[in-house]
A protein has these predicted regions:
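Phosphate/ribose-recognition catalytic cores of enzymes acting on nucleotide-derived substrates
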Residues: 3, 7-10
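Auxiliary, metal-adjacent structural segments of Zn-dependent hydrolase domains
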Residues: 11-66
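A conserved beta-strand element that flanks and buttresses the S-adenosyl-L-methionine
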Residues: 89
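Walker B catalytic acidic pair
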Residues: 92
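Short, structured coil/loop segments at alpha-helix boundaries
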Residues: 6, 21, 77-78
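Active-site scaffold of zinc-dependent metalloenzymes
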Residues: 48-86, 96-112
């Protein structure tokens, strides 16, 4: 099977979501995770969003193209790309739960 960037991104998000759901089952039981290509609307004051969190809707949307294209990795290989995508999932979950990303995934969170 041909492995595309889209498949790779979805797989990385899926494994990261599975990990955080295992770590925080009660807190994330009703949270919806979605992937979209880009955020709608104009960039905010901090630039292009990588994700959007809605606490009211219990929803996290990760934006694939900004995450992929605006990552400034010191080494552009599969491990670093996967780690960066996972870190975005962990930071979005931390934002939703009002916690620090290191608390969300102490064994896997890597700051980029």
């Amino acid at each position: 099977m041909l492995r595309t960037r889209l498949n790779f991104f979805d797989a990385c998000v899926g494994t990261a979501v599975e990990y955080v759901r295992d770590e925080w089952p009660d807190e994330l039981a009703d949270v919806r995770f979605e992937v979209a290509a880009v955020p709608s609307g104009e960039p905010g004051p901090l630039g292009v969003d990588r994700w959007r969190v809605s606490t009211r809707e219990r929803r996290i949307v990760l934006y694939r193209l900004p995450i992929e294209r605006l990552a400034h990795l010191h080494k552009d290989d599969e491990w670093h790309r996967r780690s960066f995508i996972e870190s975005c999932v962990f930071r979005a979950v931390a934002e939703l739960l009002g916690k620090d990303p290191w608390d969300i995934a102490p064994e896997r969170y890597r700051h980029f």
